[in-house]
Structure formats: structure tokens, C-alpha cells
């Protein structure tokens, strides 16, 4: 460990350097996403700095029912010196001590998290639709653009489905990319779970746009929402991080010209409070908002 390395709070003044770090590692964040992360976790965002500048970042977010670790990144030239461990400890320290802590790990980061007591909960796969993919699938079902008055319903549902109080990120995503914000509604005679059997949101990115979360009551509903979101894409790369357990939806993504890119591992470090369980229905999360947000 370099003696002149410091772990301190990440501030708005650091966003330019943090963006350069994430971009140099091939990450997708834009400056406004970094700013938004600082808004939701102003006392949980940390940076590792040397006299030469920022060499690492990590953010610990208090989502109410659990903590979330995001933006764990160390400059490749500085890896192997214990910096990731120090950043992880700082981010975990920003979360109330009784809460379980979750994160989405890459294969590279998983061994570090296992050393700190994180256990595998589930697996996901990042699916990428190339910029030169053909026309989007035909949209089916009762799907319409999500409007501002719908947000309160979506946030209430998302609280239950995700277990996280992440209204800030959801509202930000809606404002950032309304072209990916869709809601599936039942006809007047349909259903027993209100008039919202599904919704999706998305956001723009430096390299690709990201669609998620996708929440629906069936594979058909999830596919209808995803098809609508694909139709809103202007021809760039599009990413969906889908739960591996939803095999029919994963097959639909493949038919829609998405290609599997890499695995992600949803992990949890138990706390004194119980780990929120994933609801069994009627609404199901088919794709996550992203490793940054849970």
C-alpha cells in the first residue's frame, strides 16, 4: 500500500476525475449519473487519491431496508495493493450497521466480496443488442408511455418489488430517458392487481443505453415492455441485465437480437435486520435497474 494514498469523501469537484477513471475502465457512466449518485449518497461516496489524482471509487447507499455498494472501481495500474478492500470498508461503513448489504459483483470482484462475508443470492447476465441490429420486435399488449402522474404508482410498486427506497434514481431515469419509460395497463375488465401489470425505465449512457428495471406479471408483459423500449432506441447499443432464472424472457431477448456479454452475481452480506425477500408475485422483476442502483 502506498503511504501517500488517502481514502476520503468524493465530492462534486471530483466528478470530472471520477468520470475519467470510469471511462478509462470502459464503464458507461456520464457526468450527470455521477452527480445523481452523490445526491442520493453524499456521505457514502468515497475516493482513493494519490498526489497524481483519483485511483479508485466506491459508494455505499442506504436504501432503507438494505445497503447497496456501487461504483467499486480501482485503476488497473493500482490494483493488488489493498485499495479495493479499503474502499469497500469505507462504503460499508456508510450503511447503518444493522442492515444487510447487497451488491452486484463481476467475476473479477467476487473473490474480494466473499472475503468480507458476502454470499451469492442469484445470478444475472448482461445482454447487449448491437447498434446494427434489425428492426425491433413488434410491440404487443396494452403498453403506453409512462407519464409523470404514473411515477407515484411505479415508485410504490418498486418499493415492494426491489425492497429499496430508490425514488431518486427512478425519477432521474424517467427525466433522463423518457423514451424507455413504459407502463403496461390492463383493459378495464382485466386483472386483480390494479391497472399496472408492468413497467420499465431506462437511461442513456456514454457507450450504450440501459433498459431496466423491467417489472411485469408475466414473460409476455415483460417482452411487451422491452419491445416498446427497444423501439425508443435511436440505433445505438442497448443493454438489459436480466435475471437468469427467467429463462423464457432470456430466450425472448435472444430472439430480439440481444447477445449475452458477461455474468453478474447478486451478493448479500447479512446484517442484524432480515434480508428482504423477493416477492413471489403477481409482479416480478425480470431485469434490474443496473449494478449501480440494485
Question: What do the PLM-derived regions correspond to, one by one?
Answer:
Residues 74, 80-93, 115, 218-231, ...:
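Conserved acetyl-CoA-binding loop-helix of GNAT-fold acetyltransferases
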Residues 30, 36-56, 68, 100, ...:
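A short helix-loop-beta-strand connector motif used in the catalytic cores of GNAT acetyltransferases and
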Residues 16, 118-210, 220-221:
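Amide-forming acyltransferase catalytic core, primarily the GNAT-like/NAT-type
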Residues 47, 52-61, 66-73, 192-204, ...:
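Conserved beta-strand in the GNAT
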Residues 85-104, 108-110, 123-130:
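Glycine/small-residue-rich loop that forms an oxyanion/phosphate-binding "nest" at active or ligand-binding sites
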Residues 197-203, 209-242:
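Flexible loop/N-cap segments at domain edges
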Residues 105, 116-134, 203, 213, ...:
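Active-site/acyl-donor-binding loops of N-acyltransferases
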Residues 12-15, 20-32, 157-168, 233:
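Helix-loop element at the rim of GNAT/NAT acetyltransferase active sites that forms part
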